[in-house]
Design a protein with these regions (language model features):
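Structural beta-alpha unit
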Residues: 1, 5, 79-115
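Small/aliphatic-rich secondary-structure junction motif
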Residues: 3-57, 80-82, 89
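Aromatic/hydrophobic pocket-lining residues that form π-stacking "cages" and hydrophobic walls in ligand
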Residues: 27, 77, 103, 137
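Short glycine/serine/threonine/alanine-rich loop segments
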Residues: 36-37, 86, 112, 143
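Generic structural signal for helix capping and beta-alpha/helix-loop junctions
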Residues: 47-48, 98, 124
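A short acidic, glycine-rich active-site loop
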Residues: 58-72
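Gly/Ser-rich helix-loop-strand patches that form or flank binding pockets
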Residues: 108-149
Length: 149
């Protein structure tokens, strides 16, 4: 981790929601300002209970649909980043248990200096100040978290 006020590596977690895509724009701006590495991460949340009631082909379709969707987001974000002279690393992770836990784990593995995340995701609870994923990332992350409204 870098010293306070400087960044060498930034992780932005996205789910395709308006606030997460806005977070990616902030990530690009931070990466440009601080000349840092930028990682864009999407977690595919696999609901464990749903696995019991689905076929293998349906499960594969679900994963492929989500990967295709995330590739579209990554491509749009990459295009904006390249226009700013920023190279990014993109990653999709499949997670059965905890989305916030998966975000924090990747942040720790990558030794990032800051996580940028949207305040609310695709769950539809727009009236909440902070969604459950953002709340848990803020609560349990060892590095600073920048939450975008």
């Amino acid at each position: 981790m870098s010293e306070v006020g400087t960044f060498s590596k930034i992780l932005v977690a996205i789910d395709g929601s308006e606030t997460s895509l806005k977070a990616a724009e902030y990530g690009i701006e931070f990466a440009k300002k601080y000349n840092t590495q930028l990682i864009i991460l999407h977690i595919i949340h696999i609901h464990a209970a749903g696995l019991m009631y689905t076929t293998e082909s349906t499960f594969k379709q679900f994963i492929e649909k989500n990967k295709k969707e995330s590739e579209e987001w990554f491509n749009a974000i990459s295009k904006k980043a390249k226009e700013q002279g920023i190279e990014i690393k993109t990653e999709t992770v499949e997670e059965i248990y905890s989305v916030p836990g998966a975000i924090i784990k990747r942040a720790e593995e990558e030794n990032v200096d800051i996580i940028i995340i949207g305040s609310t995701g695709k769950s539809g609870f727009k009236k909440l100040l902070l969604g459950s994923v953002a709340t848990d990332v803020v609560r349990y992350s060892k590095c600073p978290v920048f939450v975008i409204k």
